[in-house]
Amino acid sequence: VYSNSGEGLHRFVDPADDEVYLYTQFETGDARRMYACFDQPDQKATFKISTIVPAHWEVISNYGVDATKDLDGDKKFIQFAESQVIATYVTAIVAGAYQSVHDEYQCDKTIPLGIYARKSFFKYVDAENIFEVTKQGFAYFEETFGLAYPFGKYDQIAVAEYNWGAMENVGCVTFHEDVLIFRSKVTERSYISRATTIHHEMAHMWFGDLVTMKWWQDLWLNESFAEWASYM
């Protein structure tokens, strides 16, 4: 089931502490590597994801946790809330010994916010700036689009060995570690670039995730809209 190519369900072992980390990357047609589905952008469905993982792991998916249960063998069962109707390519599971920090955005509803990184990288997370940029994006897009954030929570996860800059999984946005986390002093341009990427992926929640093209030949609509919106 695991891959080492960054497609489907990718497995990474951190050389710093031997902790194991998993993440999914399904765009364009790799959800079928992990579960049986009609893996097309127009064939949307509701999803109710559950996992069994080591007891010390964190698991992040598109929606919040609905139920948990401790199991024998130092494992645990996690059931996530059922999703809205979404495309297969924006479903996601991220799991491992992640550390996290949390906040919330207040609008007509409360949106839980999370930032996750592997244990050996977490000390570099600039949560204050990332949360500030995230909240600014929500405020601007909700007002500009005239539509409240259409999903539940909003987590942003830095993952290792990532082929992309970032991916707009519903409520579970994955980023290349070097895009989201700065391990040394950087220029103002780097902060602007990170903010642009955060807002690009956030714009996809409305255009790409909520409203989705019928087939991959029109993926440029998703990307051009998100790129335009990220500079607004």
Task: State the predicted function of each range.
Residues 1-16, 36, 72-74:
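A surface-exposed beta-strand-loop module
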Residues 202-217, 232:
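Catalytic Zn2+-binding segment of zinc metalloproteases
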Residues 14, 142-146, 207-208, 230-231:
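Sec-exported extracytoplasmic/periplasmic mature domains
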Residues 16-20, 41:
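N-terminal, polar/Ser/Thr-rich
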Residues 25-29, 36-199, 227-228:
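Hydrophobic helix-coil surface modules that form long, contiguous segments used
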